[in-house]
Amino acid sequence: MRLTVGQVHRHVLALASSRSCFVLGDNLPLRMLSLPRAVRFHQTAWLGTETVQDKSASLTLASLEGQNKVEYGKKEKATRIGGPKPSSRASALKVKPKVSSFNSKPAKSTLPKSAVVKKTLKIDESLFSAKSFEELGLPPLLIDRLNKEGLSTPTEVQSAAIPIISQKHDAVIQSYTGSGKTLAYLLPILSEIGPLKRPTEQDGSDKRSGVEAVIVAPSRELGMQIVREVEKILGPNDKRLVQQLVGGANRSRQEEALKKNKPLIVVGTPGRISEISAGGKLHTHGCRFLVLDEVDQLLSFNYREDMHRILEHVGRKSGTSSRDILGPLARRSERQTILVSATIPFSVIRAARSWGHDPVLVRAMSVVPLDSITVPRPVLSQTDANPNSPSNSVNQAAVNSLPPSLEHYYCISKAQHKVDTLRRCIHALEAQTVIAFMNNTKPLKDVVFKLEARGMKATELHGDLGKLARSTVLKKFKDGEFRVLVTNELSARGLDVPECDLVINLDLPTDSTHYAHRAGRTGRLGRKGTVVTICEETETFVVRKMRKQLAVPIKPCEFTEGKLLVHNEEDVE
């Protein structure tokens, strides 16, 4: 609950009851409280309530937004819940339930209203169709590095996100997998920190040597992929300025690298970042950027404690003036919070409002203030989906997460024949780089054995493999030593294999969001790709349901005589 206490008469008897009293409220059950004696307060108070949370929402870090805060200020008018009007000697005590993101302990400090700084949103829509990075205002040194890497034209989401982040807005970036979201936030960050940043008058006097950007990813694979992207842009001479802090790696070596290299950018998983921070080896109070990649996954309950520490210790929430803040918080740098994912459910919107200041939702060719986002309604058909409607932006989370250049099919097969159907599918489509998804780890080895027995080079990838083994498997698969990678949900997010031309679902994904993330492993950066779901006849209704939710055509097919034969939906039914 959020309390506002007026500073008025002291030593006023507020509650006086010989035995009991009843407490009423929107969020409090009627219960009897035993009061053996009168209780004396320094302020007189009465209660008012206001509901601010959707009780039907799922329990996530985002749905539990905010923290309990006590603000002290002048007398102000409040709405009573009943009873006689309070006397002139009493001050108003407002109670606004606002549940903590992580726990129910009160916040240590309170920001006065004068400390809040409103940011002005300026959107130059002409930049949405930018043909070069020069048009987006990136510094010359950074543009030279991009040209050396063969990157000259920004993608649509990069054209929309780079100017907004450069204006120091907190942002939620949503776009389909493989659209260039990583560079969409890395480039404006590297424009402000590191050797490629734009020159400023403070360059000579800037003594900062600590971490200035923290990027959090839910998996080791995604974290290392981001590290490689940063190293590629910084070049071989400056790649020491980025440090990985992922789980599964040697912690002592990571801490030694932090001390020796003094990196400006840290990329890691929540557990390892929180662990090293708690050990006093990672100092992030001066951090200017906090990026949460695949944020919808970081909201899951198992990251609760680690994300709590990261949000509490990385910089200071933007939108506040250091002149109006007292204590240790005033010495922290103001951070810019950026949330990224291909799918943005409404829980992420709530998290962005709680963790950031005046955040905006950035999508390809679109920038929308989060204040305009309302509770979504279900999308049942393509006609219901309007990508330009702010109120429907969240509904489009899964729809817009699919690359536009994909072909979707489903094939009916008995469970014991699925692997053979997989093999015939690969031959019929002449696919050279294939990722096959299953829901469990145990059957992976059996599928690989059957494919190898039929002369098809295959390997497995799952979380039970060690870090070195996983890295070796991925490298060999990308180098073409294996034609098929059989994996589970581990690889559904963040795995970047540009050459992948076919994704096969040997097991049905659990929902449309998982389907979108699996499908996003192919068709990256505008390339063509194919997604085939192999299901049993009793599972076809699930495919049709996902087809409606995603608003994409998933056509029935079969593989006969080495060819793909597409059926009409009416013929199948």
From Swiss-Prot:
Residue span(s) of domain Helicase ATP-binding: 162-362
Record remark: domains: The Q motif is unique to and characteristic of the DEAD box family of RNA helicases and controls ATP binding and hydrolysis.
Source domain of life: Eukaryota
Lineage: Eukaryota, Viridiplantae, Streptophyta, Embryophyta, Tracheophyta
The protein, known as: DEAD-box ATP-dependent RNA helicase 47B
Keyword Hydrolase among UniProt keywords: yes
Residue numbers covered by motif Q motif: 131-159
InterPro entries referenced in this protein's UniProt entry, alphabetically: DEAD/DEAH_box_helicase_dom, DEAD_box_RNA_helicases, Helicase_ATP-bd, Helicase_C-like, P-loop_NTPase, RNA_helicase_DEAD_Q_motif
Entry's family note: Belongs to the DEAD box helicase family.
Catalytic activity: ATP + H2O = ADP + phosphate + H(+)
Record keywords, A-Z: ATP-binding, Helicase, Hydrolase, Nucleotide-binding, RNA-binding
Binding site for ATP: S175, Y176, T177, G178, S179, G180, K181, T182
Matches recorded under Gene3D superfamilies: P-loop containing nucleotide triphosphate hydrolases
Any GO molecular function: RNA binding
Pfam families: DEAD (PF00270), Helicase_C (PF00271)
Motif placement: DEAD box: 293-296
Leading EC class: hydrolase
EC code: 3.6.4.13
Domain Helicase C-terminal, residue spans: 421-565
